[in-house]
Every structure is written in C-alpha cells, then in structure tokens.
Curated annotation (Swiss-Prot):
It comes from Homo sapiens. This is Cell growth regulator with RING finger domain protein 1. It is found in: Nucleus; Endoplasmic reticulum. Ubiquitously expressed with high expression in testis and the cerebellum. The lineage of its organism: Eukaryota, Metazoa, Chordata, Craniata, Vertebrata. GO terms for biological process: negative regulation of cell growth; negative regulation of cell population proliferation; regulation of cell cycle.
Length: 332
C-alpha cells in the first residue's frame, strides 16, 4: 500500500510543482502591477485594500463669486459680415467692451501685465496694456440681474471679410466684462472677465464659439475657465424652462472649476447621480480629464476615471461637507 502511494506521488509530483510555481508567478505579477499603479484584475485585489488614498491627491480649492456671465446667442448665425449676438448676465452693473481684431500676442502680454504690473479692472487699463493693437472697439452698459442681448458688428466701412489664414495673429473678437461701479470692485475677488471668441469668416469657417475665458482676480492672478464633463439626467424631460435651468447649473459648475461660485440652489430634479452607485449626488471632479461623475462615497475607491479610464492625478469637491449638510432637509 505504501509503495503504491509513493509511486503515485512520484508520478504526479512534477505537475504539482508546476502548478504551485505558476500560481506563485501569477500572484507575484499581480502584486507588482498593483504596486506600480497598473490595472490589475479584480480577482487579484484584496477587497480591504481597494482604497487609493495615497495615490490620488485632493486639490485644495477656494470658492469665490463670479459676477460675470457671457454666452453666444444663435452661434450658427454669427459671422464677420453679419455680426454676433452676445447674452450677458451680471450680478452688478457692468461694462461690456468688445475689441475686434485684437492682437494675439498683445492680449497675452496684457494678461501677464495684470499679474506683474497693474490690475486690469477697467477697459482703459486693458487698452493701455494692448497698446491699442485692435481694429475696432465698441462698449455697452449692462444692468445688473438682467439678461441682455447685445448685437455687435464691425462697421461696414472697415471692409474686413477675414483675419487671414491659420495661424492667425489676431483674434476675431475679444469681449471684456468689467464692473461699472468702482465700489463694487472692492466687494468681489473677480474684477474682470476676458472672453476670446472665434467668429467664422471667408477664410476660416470654424463654427462660432468661445475659445477661452479668463477670470482676472484683484490679487493679480488670472484663471482659465474650464468646462466640466457631466452625464445628463435621463429622467428629466427637456423643455424650454428645463433647458435654462440646466444652463444655470452648468454655468455654476464652470465657474467653480475656475475658482468661482454661483449662488444657484441645486434642485432635486437637476441633481446628477453618481455613475457607479447611481444613488449619491455627483460631487467630485477628476483631473486632468475633468469628468464629474463620482459621489463622496465612491471617489475613494477609484484610481482611474470610470468614464475614460485615464489615471486620476488630482481631484476636488464641488461642495464641502458643510454645504451638503445645509442642503439636506431636516427630519424629525
């Protein structure tokens, strides 16, 4: 009996050793891949070690109020010859100054002067920084809390039909929003907003759009306003009213990513659900992809964006825990 057992063990021992070595190799490979941050199959992960708090850094944000709002009305109908319609939405009386054919180089030199030399809080300050390197200027007074449509157009006697071939030395239109009352400039951290707008012409027919928006702060910094990518709520029926509400919500998110905040109270029907648990409210922005798709409970379990699979370098919350507690209804 013992002899038969020893013979059987001798016959199967090579297969047993091979299986043990192969299993050890798979486990070791999984641990090494996980240590260096590569994707590892879920079966090799320890359920108690799926939080990546040491990998993803939480970016400290400072929220400030943005008194300016600017959008393009009917961008499909805009052109150099027919002009463009802009819609403003400002919290205080403001001035909208439009510069046609503004020099690209002089504009970015002006932004640097805002940081190192003098603050651009008035149209005259920007014009001094630009050294009048623009073709035409027009200015409009904007009343507070009133959405006004402003029609801007180059004079016909200029006979400008395009701004040359790409790459260009001039932007078609640069719109500057500043506070009209000097006292209001002491209230807000954001003292002006510069919008770079592309308008199609005979040479370059790219559709009309806002290329860049820069928020200029009283402390001397300026920040590029970036769009967040958020999935739409499918339970929500589109209408004219709902469209305006979505725009207001999107605007507040855009302002927050550019170090600004709009006092728009989030309604229940406009709330966005987490793409993972489908329950929690979306609150975290993942960088650098800018997908806004995770709630407070799920963000700690992800090292890669669940939308695009890009590795998350930094993240920040749209609302602090205190703000969320205020929004929650009190129950007895």
């Amino acid at each position: 009996m013992a002899a038969v057992f020893l013979v059987t063990l001798y016959e199967y021992s090579p297969l047993f050793y091979i299986a043990v070595v192969f299993t050890c190799f798979i486990v070791t490979t999984g641990l090494v891949l996980g240590w260096f941050g590569w994707d590892v199959p879920v079966i090799l992960r320890n359920s108690e070690e799926t939080q990546f708090s040491t990998r993803v850094f939480k970016k400290q944000m400072r929220q400030v109020k943005n008194p300016f709002g600017l959008e393009i009305t009917n961008p499909s109908s805009a052109s150099i010859t027919t002009g463009i319609t802009l819609t403003t939405d400002c919290l205080e009386d403001s001035l909208l100054t439009c510069y046609w054919g503004c020099s690209v180089q002089k504009l970015y030199e002006a932004l640097q002067k805002h940081v190192y030399c003098f603050r651009i809080s008035t149209p005259q300050a920007l014009e001094d920084a630009l050294y009048s390197e623009y073709l035409y200027q027009e200015q409009y007074f904007i009343k507070k809390d009133s959405k006004e449509e402003i029609y801007c157009q180059l004079p016909r006697d200029t006979k400008i039909e395009d701004f040359g071939t790409v790459p260009r030395s001039r932007y078609p239109l640069v719109a500057l929003l500043t506070l009209a009352d000097e006292d209001d400039r002491e209230i807000y951290d954001i003292i002006s907003m510069v919008s770079v707008i592309h308008i199609p012409d005979r040479t370059y027919k790219l559709s009309c759009r806002i290329l860049y928006q820069y928020l200029l702060l009283a402390q001397g910094q300026f920040h590029d306003l970036k769009q967040l990518f958020m999935s739409a709520n499918n339970n929500f029926t589109p209408s004219n009213n709902s469209s305006s509400e979505e725009k207001n919500t999107d605007r507040s998110l855009l302002e927050k990513v550019g170090l600004s905040e709009s006092e728009v109270e989030p309604s229940e029907e406009n709330s966005k659900d987490c793409v993972v648990c489908q329950n929690g409210t979306v609150n975290w922005v993942l960088l650098p992809c800018r997908h806004t798709c995770l709630c407070d409970g799920c963000v700690k379990y992800f090292q890669q964006c669940p939308m695009c699979r890009q590795f998350v370098q930094e993240s920040f919350a749209l609302c602090s825990q205190k703000e969320q507690d205020k929004d929650k209804p009190k129950t007895l």
